[in-house]
Every structure is written in structure tokens, then in C-alpha cells.
């Protein structure tokens, strides 16, 4: 499928005021309090009593906001720079995305500590289910009407809500952990699945259902991921995905690290994405700081991000083919990944987790001889992709296992918050590198691979074609690498250019302070989304004018992708579920953070 047949995506409209006019016309300007931010979208505060009505309007307006992109909370109690905003102890925000407008809007509602409840919106957007569960889990905010408001990241027996400001952030602030036999039995009992809790029946009219645990330790679960299957024979009647086993508190960690020292933690979100994880974070921090990086920095960042797109997709390809029964290709794809990592290691000094991007630039300049390494890889990979396509992807057995399996359309994808190859496999031509170019992607020539059926096979083929386009982008970076510095000339560039510290005492002082305490960012909010390896990844940062983030919201693509599983796989066979899980391309750190 080509872009000519796809849904038309208009040019990106940052800070789109059209929706503000529509809202004012419908509800009156007095219903909203506008908040100036550096998020690139209108941010509007509304009263809780009108929240559901306003969100329903946005969902049904002409050119609707079909996707609930994100929903989460903020503990406002210690925030000092609120700039005349509505009084709030806690805030719940709703980030809505319209494909047909190519614009976003954020709605916020203020809550007092004595009345922490907001009506559920699961009847408007089905993917609000998990987001509301996480907000309750992390902040203790209630959502009346929610079908199953329960822990999602933390264990069922957990006490407290970790993202509250009064909840400890370090292990040393807790009592020493011990696991007694009684506590072990309590935890095991809490993990027991009870169908009635999820509205499931144990038997039908003429059959008894079997309930099967797939995971949390199963090779086809691709990580610490558990799915409880309700089976009639081998047919899946329903299922309940169970996540949180890989949760490490990444957003809590961000509140205790400086803006600079949090960069290595971003690598551990999608741990196959490498520097791709650094990019939305440093771009969002640079928006706060007002830093414009040199052109060379943009090109270097794009080149290395595309290298990691390729390494991630190669791992996906090998393991996906292995999931459906072919054992050999994974060894070949790992050989190709090693060739890519040879280039990555030569340039960054590291392999999987380089933590190489910096606020205002990159860690160091490109080494001598980098062009030959890149050229050798660019010449190598296309022929290998041809082999994979011919030998494996055109194989009749693989097609029989994946064509028509776990299919969904564009409307369903948007309702569940699906992005990346999963969305483009339905024919929706929405790739942020084209639709909302960042870091200079508008200067590169490449195509957006699309498919039409939205099934397990199409999701695979889209990623294979994406690797070909990444090679084109890397080749253009290699041939057109600009001259110039690899860091911005800005006071908040961290660390500052080292050469100047040997000549100017002011720069030496700045270097010392920014490395020890960290740079001080202006009080504001910023947001940046990118087209990451598994879909759209973004960082929404709140600065209170300090050396650390007041609130860091990490929105990952894999979280909504797993939430969609029950709606897609009902009525299919267990073997189809394995093919479906492989086609999603997820890692649990990207889900659980």
C-alpha cells in the first residue's frame, strides 16, 4: 500500500488554536483556564463537573480526537511555580490526539486531597482503562464507574501510592525487606486468578472453561508478562493481560536525578532502543532550556537513532520468525545486529545502552574513520533483507501462521492508542518523522512503509521495509554530514564544551556546578514525542525551577499495545496468540517502566 491510498494527514499544527475556538464556542470561554507551556499544544484546565462533557465533545467533534494518547497525574502539593493556575493538590491530565487534524490538546482537572475522584472515561476511549488503573495505583485517585479499578504496576498487596511526593524514593528510606513464610503465602494467594473478579464465567451452556497461565516466565511472552487465558478447548474465549513484573519506578527515579544524570535511565525504558530513548528526553529538556542545537548534532542524532531502529527491528524479525516455528533466521539476524553494534560501539563507545546524547548535543564528536564503517554496513544490509524476504517471509508456512491473524483496522487502532508499525499496517500514514518532523527529519528523503490488512504478517513486513528506509536515511547522513561543533553554545548545555574550561574560570565553574548539582531549568512544562522503534514514545516534563524534574511522565508505545490484546485475540487459537504477541514487538521495560 502507498501513501496515495492512505488517510490524508494535514501539516502539523503546533499550539493549534482552532480547537480552543471550538471549545469556547460550545462551552464558553469562562469554562477554561489556559496554561502557557512549551508543550506545543493548547493546555486547558476545566472543572471536574464539566470534564466528561468536554471530553465527549472532543471525541465526537468533526475531525475528532480519536486517540487518548495519554492520561496520568501530578502531585502538585510541593510545586511552587504555578503561575496563577487553579488551586490543586493533585492534577489529572488528558492528552488527546487527532490524526485528521494532526494536532493535540491537553485537558487538565484540579483535585483537592480531600476529594480525589474523577469520573471514568472508559466509555469514551476504551484504552483509558489501564491508564486510570495506573493513576489510582500511583496516586490513589479514584475513578468512579471504572470496570475494575485495581493495582496494575504494583503487587496487589502493596501499601501506598508511589508517585505521591510523600512516598519514599529510596530503598534506604524503607524498613529492611524480609519474606516470611506467612507473607509468601499471602503473596501467592493474592496472585491467584479468580475469574469472577474479571466478570468471567467458569462454564458455558455446554462446557467448562479452562483457565491457563501463559507466563510470567514463558519464552513467547517476551519478558516477565502474564496472560490468563479463558479457553474452550484451544479457542480463546477471553484473556486478562497482567503486567507490572518489570516495573522499576522510572518516573519516580527522575524526581531524584538531575536533568543530566537521568539520561542513562532513559536507555533502560525500551532497552533495545539505545539512543532512541535519549532523544525525546533531551529534546524536551532543550525546549525547557531554549537550546537550539547545531545542525551537525541533529544529523548525528538521526543517524544513530536509525541505527538503533535497525538493530531493534532485526531482533524483532529473528525472534518473530522463531515464534512461528523457524529456528535458523534468528542466528542470521543476530549476526547482522553485531555488524551494526560494531559501528555503534566505534562511535559511542558502548553497545546496547550508550547514554550518548547530551542536553545541547552529543557526548563527543564522530571518530576518525567512521564513514567507512557506516558505508560497509549500508552496503551490507539491503542484500540481507532481500534474503530474509525471499527465504523466510515468503515461506508458505509462515504466511499460513500469520496472514489474517490478529487483524484490526485503523479505527480500532486509534481507539486503543496503537502507534508505530501496528498503526501503519492498517493503512494509516502516520509517522512522526514525516507528519511532525523533529531534529531535521524534514531534510531527508525516505518513504513511510504502509500495509492494508493490519494483521500479524503486515506488521512484520512494515518493519522490514522500515529497515530499508533507515538505511536510506543513514546513507544520506553519511554523505551530507555537516561541519561544526557537536554541542550547542548555550549556558545550559551539559556538560559545557570542555575546551573552554581550560581557559575561562566562569566556564569551569559552570562545568563543576552542572556536573555536580545539575543545570537549573526554567520553571515550565515541555513535551516531545518521537517515532521510536516500537511506536510513539514521549517525555512530558514539569520543571519547578530546580536542578531536577518535578514530574517526568514517560509515555511508551508498548503499554497500550498490550492493553489491546483481549479485543483482538478473542475467538482465535492459542497458536494465533503466540504469532500475535510476536508481531506486536514489545519489551516489558517499555510497558512497565
From Swiss-Prot:
NADH dehydrogenase I subunit C, as annotated region: 1-184
Main location: membrane
Key word Transport present: yes
Coiled-coil regions, chain positions: none
Recorded catalytic activity of this chain's protein: a quinone + NADH + 5 H(+)(in) = a quinol + NAD(+) + 4 H(+)(out)
InterPro entries: NADH_DH_suC (IPR010218), NADH_DH_suCD (IPR023062), NADH_Q_OxRdtase_suD (IPR001135), NADH_quin_OxRdtase_su_C/D-like (IPR037232), NADH_UbQ_OxRdtase_30kDa_su (IPR001268), NADH_UbQ_OxRdtase_49kDa_CS (IPR014029), NDH1_su_D/H (IPR022885), NiFe-Hase_large (IPR029014)
GO CC terms of this entry: NADH dehydrogenase complex; plasma membrane
Membrane topology: Peripheral membrane protein
Localization terms from the record: Cell inner membrane
Family: In the N-terminal section; belongs to the complex I 30 kDa subunit family. In the C-terminal section; belongs to the complex I 49 kDa subunit family.
Role of this protein: NDH-1 shuttles electrons from NADH, via FMN and iron-sulfur (Fe-S) centers, to quinones in the respiratory chain. The immediate electron acceptor for the enzyme in this species is believed to be ubiquinone. Couples the redox reaction to proton translocation (for every two electrons transferred, four hydrogen ions are translocated across the cytoplasmic membrane), and thus conserves the redox energy in a proton gradient.
HAMAP family in the cross-refs: NDH1_NuoC, NDH1_NuoCD_1, NDH1_NuoD
Protein name: NADH-quinone oxidoreductase subunit C/D
Species the sequence originates in: Pseudomonas syringae pv. tomato (strain ATCC BAA-871 / DC3000)
Amino acid at each position: 500500500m502507498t501513501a496515495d491510498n492512505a488517510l490524508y494527514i494535514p501539516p502539523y499544527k503546533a499550539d493549534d488554536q482552532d480547537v480552543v475556538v471550538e471549545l469556547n464556542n460550545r462551552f464558553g470561554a469562562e469554562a477554561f483556564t489556559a496554561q502557557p507551556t512549551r508543550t506545543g499544544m493548547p493546555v486547558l484546565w476545566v472543572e471536574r463537573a464539566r470534564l466528561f462533557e468536554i471530553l465527549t465533545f472532543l471525541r465526537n467533534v468533526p475531525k475528532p480526537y480519536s486517540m487518548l494518547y495519554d492520561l496520568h497525574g501530578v502531585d502538585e502539593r510541593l510545586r511552587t511555580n504555578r503561575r496563577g493556575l487553579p488551586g490543586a493538590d493533585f492534577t489529572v491530565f488528558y492528552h488527546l490526539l487527532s490524526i485528521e487534524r494532526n494536532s493535540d490538546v491537553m485537558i487538565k482537572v484540579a483535585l483537592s486531597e480531600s476529594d480525589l475522584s474523577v469520573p471514568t472515561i472508559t466509555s469514551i476511549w476504551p484504552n483509558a482503562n489501564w491508564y486510570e488503573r495506573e493513576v489510582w495505583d500511583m496516586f490513589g485517585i479514584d475513578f468512579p464507574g471504572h470496570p475494575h479499578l485495581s493495582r496494575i504496576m504494583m503487587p496487589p498487596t502493596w501499601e501506598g501510592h508511589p508517585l505521591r511526593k510523600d512516598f519514599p524514593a529510596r530503598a534506604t528510606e524503607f524498613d529492611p525487606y524480609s519474606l516470611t513464610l506467612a507473607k509468601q503465602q499471602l503473596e501467592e494467594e493474592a496472585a491467584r486468578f479468580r475469574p469472577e473478579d474479571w466478570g468471567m464465567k467458569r462454564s458455558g451452556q455446554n462446557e467448562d472453561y479452562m483457565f491457563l497461565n501463559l507466563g510470567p516466565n514463558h519464552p513467547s511472552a517476551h519478558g516477565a508478562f502474564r496472560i490468563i487465558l479463558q479457553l474452550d478447548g484451544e479457542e480463546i474465549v477471553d484473556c486478562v493481560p497482567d503486567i507490572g513484573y518489570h516495573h522499576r519506578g522510572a518516573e519516580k527515579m527522575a524526581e531524584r536525578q538531575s536533568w543530566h544524570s537521568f539520561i542513562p535511565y532513559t536507555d533502560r525504558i525500551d532497552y533495545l532502543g539505545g539512543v532512541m530513548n535519549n532523544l525525546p528526553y533531551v529534546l524536551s529538556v532543550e525546549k525547557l532550556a531554549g537550546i537550539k542545537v547545531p545542525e551537525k548534532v541533529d544529523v548525528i542524532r538521526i543517524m544513530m537513532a536509525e541505527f538503533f531502529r535497525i538493530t531493534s527491528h532485526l531482533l524483532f524479525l529473528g525472534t518473530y520468525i522463531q515464534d512461528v516455528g523457524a529456528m535458523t533466521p534468528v542466528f542470521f539476524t543476530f549476526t547482522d545486529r553485531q555488524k551494526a553494534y560494531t559501528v555503534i560501539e566505534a562511535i559511542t563507545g558502548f553497545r546496547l545502552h550508550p547514554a550518548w546524547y547530551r542536553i545541547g548535543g552529543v557526548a563527543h564528536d564522530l571518530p576518525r574513520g567512521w564513514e567507512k564503517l557506516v558505508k560497509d554496513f549500508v552496503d551490507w544490509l539491503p542484500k540481507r533483507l532481500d534474503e530474509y524476504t525471499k527465504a523466510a517471509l515468503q515461506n508458505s508456512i509462515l504466511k499460513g501462521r500469520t496472514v489474517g491473524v490478529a487483524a484490526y483496522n485503523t479505527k480500532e487502532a486509534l481507539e486503543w492508542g496503537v502507534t508505530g508499525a501496528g498503526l501503519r499496517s492498517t493503512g494509516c500514514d502516520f509517522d512522526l518523522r514525516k507528519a511532525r518532523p523533529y531534529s531535521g527529519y524534514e531534510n531527508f528523503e525516505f518513504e513511510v512503509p504502509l500495509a492494508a490488512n493490519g494483521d500479524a504478517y503486515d506488521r512484520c513486513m512494515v518493519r522490514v521495509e522500515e529497515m530499508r528506509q533507515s538505511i536510506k536515511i543513514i546513507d544520506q547522513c553519511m554523505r551530507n554530514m555537516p561541519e561544526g561543533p557537536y554541542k550547542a553554545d548555550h549556558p545550559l548545555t551539559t556538560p559545557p564544551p570542555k575546551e573552554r574550561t581550560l581557559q575561562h574560570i566562569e566556564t569551569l565553574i559552570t562545568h563543576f556546578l552542572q556536573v555536580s548539582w545539575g543545570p537549573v531549568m526554567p520553571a515550565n512544562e515541555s513535551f516531545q514525542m518521537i517515532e521510536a522503534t516500537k511506536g510513539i514514545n514521549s517525555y512530558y516534563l514539569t520543571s519547578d525551577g530546580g536542578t531536577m524534574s518535578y514530574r517526568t511522565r514517560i509515555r511508551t508505545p508498548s503499554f497500550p499495545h498490550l492493553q489491546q490484546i483481549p479485543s483482538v485475540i478473542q475467538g482465535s487459537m492459542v497458536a494465533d496468540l503466540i504469532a500475535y504477541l510476536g508481531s506486536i514487538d514489545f519489551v516489558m521495560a517499555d510497558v512497565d517502566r
